[in-house]
Every structure is written in C-alpha cells, then in structure tokens.
C-alpha cells in the first residue's frame, strides 16, 4: 500500500511507482486542513461528518461520494465515527487513457477543472453496494499484487 508523507500539510505518495492506492479509515473528531498532489475520490460508508473544501462546508453522510482535486484544501471539521474509503491516484495512473476516460458519463466532472462549486453525489442503496464491492476488490488487489 502507498504510504503518505506529510510536509507543510501537503500529502504525497512515497511510492510513485504504484500511483493508485485504496485506503479505508475511520475519522472521529477533526482532521486538519490539508491538500494533496493527487486526486482523491472519497466514499462515505458509515457515520457522518462536517467537511470543508474550498471554503465551503457541508455535511457528509453514508452514501456520499465526492472528489478532491490536486491542490484543493479540505478538512473534516467534526467527524463522528465516519468510516470512509479513499481512492488516491495520479493522472499518470490512467496512462494514456485519460482523454477517453474523461468522455465517460460523469468523469469530466471528476477529472476536469471545477466548473462551479464543490459537489458531492449521494448514492442509492444499489449504487452503494456496487461502489463498496469495487473498492473492496481494488483494496484486495492492492494488498495481493
């Protein structure tokens, strides 16, 4: 698994040879204001949290999915047993496929420049199961590669 290093509140992978990582974690309390040099897709599995991104604060609940782009500053202000998955990656992980991937439904909003304010998706039950299965499979592949 990729390990994160902290320098001046900017997170980065220590191992750029494998530019994708799946992490699951539980937040409780506050997670300091920070940014990173990679894309972060976040899925909230359980719990709830107040989250700040680009000076906008919102409540996150189970089933929420959102993206943090490189350089965006964000923090979990008040997390209450928030269990989440992070899919962390660099654009080079898409290795030449990024122009095709961006054409897929919803991907231009995730990978392109923000056209408007920070947004999140709230998944229905079937979508949650599908996302969770995919994340768990990716996590297993990461550990067993």
Predicted regions span which residues?
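Generic protein-terminus/edge-of-domain signal
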Residues: 1-61, 65, 102-119
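A hydrophobic/aromatic-rich effector-binding and dimerization subdomain
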Residues: 2-19, 77-143
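Extended, non-catalytic scaffold segments that flank or surround catalytic motifs
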Residues: 24-26, 71, 97
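Histidine-centered divalent metal-coordination motifs
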Residues: 34-36, 74, 90
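Catalytic metal- and UDP-sugar-binding loop of GT-A-like glycosyltransferases, i.e.
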Residues: 44, 68, 87-89
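Short loop segments at secondary-structure junctions
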Residues: 46-48, 71, 92
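Short beta-strand His + acidic residue motifs that chelate non-heme Fe in jelly-roll/DSBH
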Residues: 50-52, 68, 73-80, 85
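Short coil/turn residues that cap or connect secondary-structure elements
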Residues: 55, 142-145
């Amino acid at each position: 698994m990729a390990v994160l290093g902290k320098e001046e509140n900017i997170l980065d992978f220590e191992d750029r040879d494998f530019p994708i990582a799946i992490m699951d974690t539980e937040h409780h309390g506050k997670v300091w204001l920070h940014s990173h040099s990679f894309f972060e897709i976040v899925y909230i599995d359980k719990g709830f949290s107040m989250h700040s991104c680009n000076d906008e604060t919102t409540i996150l609940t189970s089933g929420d999915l959102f993206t943090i782009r490189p350089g965006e500053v964000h923090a979990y202000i008040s997390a209450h047993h928030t269990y989440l998955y992070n899919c962390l990656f660099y654009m080079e992980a898409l290795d030449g496929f990024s122009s095709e991937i961006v054409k897929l439904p919803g991907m231009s909003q995730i990978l392109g420049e923000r056209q408007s304010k920070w947004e999140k998706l709230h998944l229905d039950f079937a979508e949650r199961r599908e996302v969770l299965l995919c994340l768990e499979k990716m996590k297993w592949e990461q550990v067993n590669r």
